[in-house]
Amino acid sequence: MNIHVADNAREAARMLLRNMLAVIRQPSGAGGEGDTVNVAFSGGSTPAILFDVWVEEFAELTPWNRFRVYWVDERCVSSENKDSNYRLAKIHLLDKIPLTSEQIFRIRGEQEDAEREVLRYSSMVLSQLPLDGRIPVFDFEQMGIPLPSFLGRRNCFILWLLMRLVLILLPGNVALL
């Protein structure tokens, strides 16, 4: 893992996006040229910075037709709730880029039967992602570091899988690749 310290959070987001797009342009593997790019988002407030920079500065450079978007965590709330990770991504990214509904795979946090939703989402992810052996793998995963107030919560979904490149934007100005 490489640690990069930027002058500010927006510059850290730029570092992450430049790195991701460079990998996508490689001839093959990890979302290389022509491959489907499977990216997973987490929640919290920090991704908004990443999404905003992506839309403002990197949208035209991103091959959106190759992207499939997933989530690795979601709170058990409606997709319209202010605490929904999907809602954050929708407002700051998804409503501003040319993705179709067939490219977006969200966790349905509003489902009353959380266990059933976990099974549905897990099965769908298993059927969509490429495998490393028998384990599904995301090409990129944007992760956050949970605040202490979030740790120990039970009203959320969390999905842990392998990923080829982890993009971590910490509050402040640190990018981990």
PLM segments and residue spans:
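N-terminal glycine-/serine-/threonine-rich phosphate-binding loop
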Residues: 1-39
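Class I SAM-dependent methyltransferase SAM-binding "motif I" and its flanking Rossmann-like core
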Residues: 140-175
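Glycine-rich beta-strand-to-loop/alpha-helix junction loops that act as flexible
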Residues: 41-46, 143-145
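Alpha-helix termini
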Residues: 24-34, 58-61, 127-135
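Boundary/activation segment at the start of structured domains
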Residues: 4, 23, 51-56, 68
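A glycine- and small-aliphatic-rich helix-loop capping segment at beta-alpha/alpha-beta transitions
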Residues: 52-63, 87, 147-156
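Ligand-binding beta-strand-loop-alpha-helix segment within the catalytic cores
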Residues: 62-139
